[in-house]
């Protein structure tokens, strides 16, 4: 089976093609506004609209297949920003109708999880899903990815990105990467609010507090980036460890764009090893939003018997991870 996946839930536009378990193409473009600016939905959607057909053509060429060779078209149903999601869904529906091939709507969060499991070969891990739009601690049970804990306000990636904008750090290739680079030069830890409530975390207060500490001195900016990472990542490690203890799992898998951060991987790895376990993570090809993860989960769904009418193939900005029945797993 050959599947094409289209992703565009935020500022990343991705087209991926897979033939069963073989990745044929994984192409991606990024909408990056000027330093200090965020991702405005209208502008993000226009970026996707003007580039998606070209990216589809590039992906087909790289994969060495024709459009007629594609057996199913898959797209991100949600969660995400409404306008960018709609652009990608419209193209996916058009391709499906034009080629008379099935269309599969995919949950963005589930796609991150299953792609992480596919790449790392993690069996049944506790999952930390950390991105610009989501922060969840997840484990599989009874054909669902259950949410053990999550952010009570803003996502960890949103917190980091907004602080990067406050510092006027570059948005390309990613504001979080700019913070990570600054953090590596930090020397002094500056105390920040640390908010963990049971299995849930909160980052809005940290963001408000750290913005008030910004100074012109470059070293202060580096120290603040370092302190922000240490604080928010410590909270994530704490709640993830609690989920591992509850589930008796020896595996933890980090997915989502923030999962690219090497310091987060290091801290989570230390915790996992102290528990006699292992931490799995992927590189930026698969941690960051991409089309191939959509193609992969679409294939899993189709092979397990999922079928959708065109009228069911819409988008939703709020599409919970635990609302999806996982029909392709038998353990």
UniProtKB/Swiss-Prot annotation:
Localization, UniProt: Cytoplasm; Nucleus
The protein's required cofactors: a divalent metal cation
GO CC, alphabetical: cytoplasm; EKC/KEOPS complex; nucleus
Catalytic activity entry: L-threonylcarbamoyladenylate + adenosine(37) in tRNA = N(6)-L-threonylcarbamoyladenosine(37) in tRNA + AMP + H(+)
Record organism: Encephalitozoon cuniculi (strain GB-M1) (Microsporidian parasite)
Family from the record: Belongs to the KAE1 / TsaD family.
Cofactor note: Binds 1 divalent metal cation per subunit.
Binding site for substrate: 129-133, 161, 176, 180, 261
Residues bound to a divalent metal cation: 108, 112, 129, 289
Name of the protein: tRNA N6-adenosine threonylcarbamoyltransferase
Subunit: Component of the EKC/KEOPS complex composed of at least BUD32, CGI121, GON7, KAE1 and PCC1; the whole complex dimerizes.
